[in-house]
Design a protein with these regions (language model features):
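Short, structured motif recognition centered on aromatic/hydrophobic residues
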Residues: 42-51, 61, 65, 81-82
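A short structural micro-motif
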Residues: 52, 71, 84-91
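Residues forming well-ordered secondary-structure scaffolds
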Residues: 76-81, 93-96
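Mid-chain, well-packed structural core segment of small domains
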Residues: 59-79
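Short acidic/histidine-centered micro-motifs embedded in hydrophobic/aromatic stretches
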Residues: 81-85, 100
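Acidic, glycine/proline-rich low-complexity segments that act as flexible tails and inter-domain linkers
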Residues: 1-42, 53-55, 61-62, 70, ...
């Protein structure tokens, strides 16, 4: 379910109230809420590719990468999406997009490394709590 957007009003409400209203209520409110037509995950993918194609790798691009991640796009998928889009949008734009995507998905790498470290059994966990006693026959 789409989250109610207020960033436009918070950033530009007094300076450009109509733009803020269109941003929050129309673009995000109406456009992103039509999940019966296109899922949030798919909208995120389309948005990331559209921004990359324009060469917009600013805070809005980072926001949409994070949104894509939160909407279920995996690191493997974003890498494939950006690689595929690079052939149509341009290699330099893809490089810029990858730099930001790498940052957004970096915490996954850290969590994976931590989980891997904790999944390796420690030597003392393999030692039985009491010594084995075999009966004499």
């Amino acid at each position: 379910m789409a989250v109610k957007q207020t960033a436009g009003r918070e950033a530009l409400g007094k300076f450009a109230p109509k733009f803020a209203e269109l941003n929050d209520d129309v673009l995000f409110g109406q456009g992103w809420s039509r999940e019966d037509k296109l899922s949030l995950r798919d909208r995120s993918i389309v948005t990331v590719v559209a921004l990359m194609a324009q060469g917009l790798t600013d805070s809005s691009f980072q926001y949409h990468l994070t949104t894509a991640k939160n909407n279920g796009v995996t690191k493997t998928e974003i890498a494939e999406i950006l690689t595929h889009a690079a052939f149509y949008a341009g290699w330099p734009k893809a490089w810029a997009a990858f730099r930001m995507a790498k940052e957004v998905w970096a915490e996954d790498d850290a969590a994976d490394a931590k989980a891997k470290h904790h999944s390796i059994p420690q030597i003392w966990e393999q030692i039985p709590p009491e010594p084995l006693c075999l009966p004499f026959v």
